[in-house]
């Protein structure tokens, strides 16, 4: 399966594919191209996956002919969530940041005959948007079957709280289309098998002293600690909870992400 990863960031969807391959050894994929507007994200993606062609081009410039030439069988995407966030202006499709998504839905999905699978991730609230309405209508018109989810990583054994909307779609007509959002995974057998090996705490997700990483680069100085210690959201390796990082992480002290501290196995806060 040849995959096109759009709004690719640092490669989260690609990592998800690799995780799925551990459980489904016969599952084969090839991410043939990744596209994101952020130069910084693209540099990180290239570091993580040096064999993937990474582009900083405008998604609105993609054509059905190009995707057919690349024989794209699947599109994985995480479109900008700002037009749909509950804290934002909720301009939906009137927000210019929705234009690349609309181009995908209106120009690419209906006209790329090789396309058989779609995976989309977005913020909670997308499911109530006009953009969502346009997406599911297009999928139905193009003979896709789809299922939608509102789930949090903690439900999958991952120590992070980040409720998100997911949609999976396929042209496989044997796929059972759901008539409502799924938020309870307790009865999903595949979920039980795939994530039972996951760590329940942060220990396996953080850097250790023997990693090629200089801790001095990210240590908080006494001035910052003295001013903001009471609002820091502190976690340790044994913590079973974390929240997502925002763009303001490193600039603002409160509500932008977790601070990790590791001093032996204990911490005392005055």
What spans do the regions from the language model cover?
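Class I S-adenosyl-L-methionine
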Residues: 62-72, 84-252, 262-268
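Core alpha/beta nucleotide-donor-binding catalytic domains of modification enzymes
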Residues: 1-115, 124-130
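Cytochrome P450 core scaffold surrounding the K-helix E-X-X-R motif
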Residues: 254-257
């Amino acid at each position: 399966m040849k995959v096109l990863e759009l709004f690719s960031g640092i490669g989260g969807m690609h990592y998800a594919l690799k995780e799925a391959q551990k459980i489904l050894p016969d599952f084969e994929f090839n991410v043939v191209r990744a596209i994101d507007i952020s130069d910084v994200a693209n540099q990180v993606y290239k570091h993580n996956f040096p064999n993937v062609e990474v582009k900083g081009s405008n998604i609105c410039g993609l054509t059905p002919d190009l995707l057919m030439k690349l024989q794209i069988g699947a599109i994985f995407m995480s479109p900008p969530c700002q037009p749909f966030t509950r804290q934002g202006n909720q301009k939906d499709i009137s927000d210019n940041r929705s234009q690349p998504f609309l181009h995908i839905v209106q120009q690419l999905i209906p006209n790329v005959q090789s396309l058989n699978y779609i995976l989309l991730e977005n913020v909670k609230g997308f499911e109530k948007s006009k953009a969502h309405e346009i997406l599911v209508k297009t999928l139905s018109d193009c003979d896709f079957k789809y299922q939608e989810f509102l789930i949090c990583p903690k439900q999958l054994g991952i120590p992070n709280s980040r409720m998100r909307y997911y949609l999976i779609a396929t042209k496989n007509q044997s796929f059972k289309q759901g008539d409502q959002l799924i938020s309870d995974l307790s009865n999903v057998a595949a979920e039980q098998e795939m994530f039972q090996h996951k760590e329940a705490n942060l220990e396996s997700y953080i850097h250790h002293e023997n990693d090629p990483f200089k801790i001095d680069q990210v240590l908080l100085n006494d001035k910052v600690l003295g001013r903001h210690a009471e609002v820091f959201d502190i976690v340790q390796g044994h913590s079973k909870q974390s929240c997502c990082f925002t763009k303001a992480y490193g600039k603002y002290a409160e509500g932008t992400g977790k601070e990790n501290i590791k001093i032996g196995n204990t911490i005392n806060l005055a």
